[in-house]
Swiss-Prot record:
Domain PPIase FKBP-type, first and last residues per copy: 162-243
Main subcellular location of this protein, as a coarse class: cytoplasm
Domain of life where this protein originates: Bacteria
A molecular-function term among this protein's GO annotations: ribosome binding
Localization terms from the record: Cytoplasm
Keywords: Cell cycle, Cell division, Chaperone, Cytoplasm, Isomerase, Rotamase
UniProt-listed Enzyme Commission number(s): 5.2.1.8
Keyword Isomerase: yes
Cellular component terms per the entry's GO annotation: cytoplasm
BP terms from Gene Ontology: 'de novo' cotranslational protein folding; cell division; chaperone-mediated protein folding; protein transport; protein unfolding
Protein name stated in the entry: Trigger factor
Amino acid sequence: MKSSVEQLSPTRVRIKVEVPFAELEPDFQRAYKELAKQVRLPGFRPGRAPVKLLEARFGREAMLDQIVNDAVPSRYGQALAESEIQPLGRPDIEVTQKEYGQDLAFTAEVDVRPEIALPDLTGLSVSVDAIEATDDEVNAELESLRARFGTLTEVERPVATGDFISIDLSAAVDGEDVPNAAAEGLSHEVGSGRLIAGLDDAVVGLSVDESRVFTAKLAAGDHAGRDAEVTVTVKSVKERELPEPDDEFAQLASEFDTIDELRASLREQVLQAKRVGQAEQIRNATIDALLERVDVPTPESYVQAQYEGVLHSALSGINNDEARFNELLVEQGSSRDAFDAEARTASEKDVKRQLLLDALADDLKVQVGQEDLTERLVLTSRQYGIEPQQLFAYLQENNQLPSMFADVRRELAVKAVAQAATVTDTDGNTIDTSEFFGKPPENDVTDLLDDDADGDAGVDADGDTENSAEPADADSADAAQGAG
């Protein structure tokens, strides 16, 4: 077999393949033997029918089509291996010569990972927002904790924001009651905005057994999206009494003896939550700083696949109803054109990030260990509320493990670069990234990039490097949702 590669663009190639007919003859012999076992021809025992008779009965062209259909995928894979091409997506294949006794010829056009000239990482610096825990934020946490230990007391007064009420609801469209839209004895915290838009405003000021009618859009059922006249009747009103924020409360609600110690602990919790956000900001700022230094060509089909994943996620929550989706966009002050433009821009940026990180992982010789994969599996399963074993089984069944592997490999590449970067906050403080990403390796990242690495960066879950180019982010999320 002979193959050659023509570079059509930085992200697309055409592979020309010629397969000598002699290489296909064993395939023909096997196909005829299988066919002979399956057919019954007068005068011949099963499996003994002559080839000439089988050709006359079923047609040589039909057999040729079957052989070619079976041969092209394997020969395409062989051509990929010989040329060391890393494809992105499925190829567009065209058979250019197919004749019995003649060489088989076909072309395959496919998107590929582009060659990326990696930037100089020497002196890479990024800036992120400074973090602090304000008194207001600490007080809000304290109020939330007090609310958990509060008691509800029934009161004889009109409803006010913050009250807990029991209500009856009914709805009508065009004067006709809406079936299944009535409910009795619903509990609601006034001001939470959890039940129906407009409900909180409608109940404030009402006393027990008083009613009010307001207009709201129905979210589900046969009348979903239509305006309905909603009637709400207040059945009871309770207010929450909060414990005093003193030492006694601190001992009741925590392991601390004093309210000052509890406040200090809450302040640290606020800071810790902000550190998580700061770590993500460092990650994104590091990638953005790299993208500013390098040009990353983007395969259009790869971007399109990413966009379709975004659209699929957006539509899945409304039963893939595109008409309703377009209406919701208009209600939110947007449009389908604006959504498509924003989604495509975001998809292109995501693809650039993925391709850049794959190239970095190659040059940094990133190795993904079992511990790295296990950690990601546990974190993802917690995020979606399922058991790690359940998620692993789903990923394996749906061939999503290579995507998760690729995602973890990219994260390790970002981690390595962030460890070597100089990170400061907007107040001018230098941030110790080891708190987020651990200590840097003994060999500096910039030294590794200067090495004459051949790009063979370990193996993926299937034992080769091809799948490191997969768009893992969306796939992993979809897989986790499916497993749930």
